[in-house]
Amino acid sequence: MDNEIIVRSMHTVEKEKACVAGMPVKDTIKVSDELGYSANTPDRKSLWQIQTPQCFEYDLLAQSYDKLFSDMSYGKSVPAITDDAMIVEYGSDTKVKLIEGSYENIKVTTPEDMGDCRTFFKETQKNVKKLEISVDIL
């Protein structure tokens, strides 16, 4: 994650109360039925893969968590939560603003994601070494 994404997120949350970085999906996404068949294909234009940072006004996030935990303690059915943005969507009427992140901003969710991370960091290190060498020659 680069500083520019963090700064844009901080500025956005000042205006919007809630924002997450992400990128439009590149892949076709299928929704499956309970038997594993394709039920439909949503329009890719409306789908984003969400990354970090996820930024919220503190009180908004705290109140959203309170509602979630309260509902759970009373045995209410709640969705399977995958990130803080989902908690804000569940626990408030506030819309979460999507801002552009970077396809290089890798979100580590599964063990397989660690391989992507390692590859990215190896490539980054190669570029840093090249830069250091060119600076040393000057």
Where are these regions (language model features)?
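A generic structural signal for alpha->beta connector loops
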Residues: 15, 35, 93-95
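Short, flexible, basic/aromatic active-site loop/helix in glycosyltransferases
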Residues: 31-56
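Short hydrophobic/aromatic segments of transmembrane alpha-helices and their interfaces
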Residues: 11, 44-45, 96-98
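Fold-independent oxyanion-binding glycine-rich loops
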Residues: 1, 23-25, 44, 52, ...
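Conserved beta-loop-beta/alpha segment of the NTase-like Rossmann-fold superfamily
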Residues: 1-32, 51
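Short secondary-structure transition/capping segments
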Residues: 4, 32-34, 108-113
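Short secondary-structure boundary/capping segments
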Residues: 10-11, 38-40, 88
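Conserved alpha/beta core of the MobA/IspD/sugar-nucleotide pyrophosphorylase nucleotidyltransferase superfamily
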Residues: 49-138
